[in-house]
């Protein structure tokens, strides 16, 4: 369990994990189980940052959370926006996403996301960041459960065929968040609904999901939950 968790941590963050992997193609399909568990780490960083009154400490924890975790998904978020909002064929959208060039859609919505995140970081209860970070990573499992790979290569394709039992196993890591039934219920419903809708959109745009889409969905769910939990 610890071995797989560390591999999962290294897979969806910038934290270097130097572990020799045996039977990689088999083991990598188990990694999504631990995605929600990984989400507790940036969630706790943002929680502490939001709890401190000192402005410099707020900045420090924000940088740590983004540098080691959220920036990893922010890249996918930007690529997904540029690809999905481009009025062209599925093949062209996939090409745009694979190139990774930052286009106007990515610049605008990426900037908007950061501004909204920063505003909420200063205003809403810090505990909401734990919920949003954990459920944001959980959304990647839901998206894989609902969808299929858009192409046969790439990081996203490694997890397919997605083992349905992994969704159940990963759900156990949500249980500590039951201490607030209201936040848990809202987070769960929003995450499931958004992930399902995202799978429909992604299938329509590019014929499935990619690693960029998974990362983008994680960040979109994260931001959406912060907005929703911040107003309830």
UniProtKB/Swiss-Prot annotation:
GO cellular component: plasma membrane
Molecular function GO labels: adenosylcobinamide-GDP ribazoletransferase activity; cobalamin 5'-phosphate synthase activity
Compartments where found: Cell inner membrane
Matches recorded under InterPro entries: CobS (IPR003805)
Chief location: membrane
Gene Ontology biological process terms from the UniProt entry: cobalamin biosynthetic process
Membrane protein topology class: Multi-pass membrane protein
Keywords for this protein: Cell inner membrane, Cell membrane, Cobalamin biosynthesis, Magnesium, Membrane, Transferase, Transmembrane, Transmembrane helix
Top-tier EC class: transferase
Residues annotated as transmembrane: 32-52, 54-74, 102-122, 126-146, 172-192, 212-232
Pathway: Cofactor biosynthesis; adenosylcobalamin biosynthesis; adenosylcobalamin from cob(II)yrinate a,c-diamide: step 7/7
Cofactor needs: Mg(2+)
Known catalytic reactions: alpha-ribazole + adenosylcob(III)inamide-GDP = adenosylcob(III)alamin + GMP + H(+); alpha-ribazole 5'-phosphate + adenosylcob(III)inamide-GDP = adenosylcob(III)alamin 5'-phosphate + GMP + H(+)
Pfam families: CobS
HAMAP family: CobS
Function in brief: Joins adenosylcobinamide-GDP and alpha-ribazole to generate adenosylcobalamin (Ado-cobalamin). Also synthesizes adenosylcobalamin 5'-phosphate from adenosylcobinamide-GDP and alpha-ribazole 5'-phosphate.
Membership in a protein family: Belongs to the CobS family.
Protein name: Adenosylcobinamide-GDP ribazoletransferase
Organism: Thermosipho melanesiensis (strain DSM 12029 / CIP 104789 / BI429)
């Amino acid at each position: 369990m610890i071995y797989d968790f560390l591999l999962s941590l290294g897979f969806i963050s910038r934290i270097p994990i130097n572990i020799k992997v045996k039977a990689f193609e088999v083991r990598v399909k188990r990694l999504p189980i631990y995605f929600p568990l990984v989400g507790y780490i940036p969630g706790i960083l943002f929680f502490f940052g939001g709890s401190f009154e000192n402005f410099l400490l707020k900045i420090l924890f924000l940088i740590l959370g983004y540098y080691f975790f959220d920036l990893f998904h922010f890249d996918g978020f930007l690529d997904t926006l540029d690809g999905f909002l481009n009025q062209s064929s599925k093949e062209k959208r996939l090409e745009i996403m694979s190139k990774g060039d930052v286009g106007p859609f990515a610049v605008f919505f990426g900037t908007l996301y950061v501004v909204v995140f920063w505003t909420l970081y200063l205003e809403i209860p810090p505990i909401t960041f734990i919920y949003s970070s954990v459920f944001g990573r959980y959304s990647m499992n839901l998206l894989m459960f609902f969808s299929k790979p858009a192409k046969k290569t790439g990081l996203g394709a490694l997890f397919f065929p997605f083992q349905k039992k992994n969704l159940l196993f990963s759900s156990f890591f949500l249980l500590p968040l039951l201490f607030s039934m209201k936040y848990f219920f809202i987070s769960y419903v929003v995450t499931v609904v958004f992930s399902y809708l995202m799978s429909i959109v992604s299938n329509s745009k590019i014929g499935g999901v990619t690693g960029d889409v998974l990362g983008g969905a994680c960040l979109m769910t994260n931001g959406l939950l912060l907005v929703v939990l911040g107003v309830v």
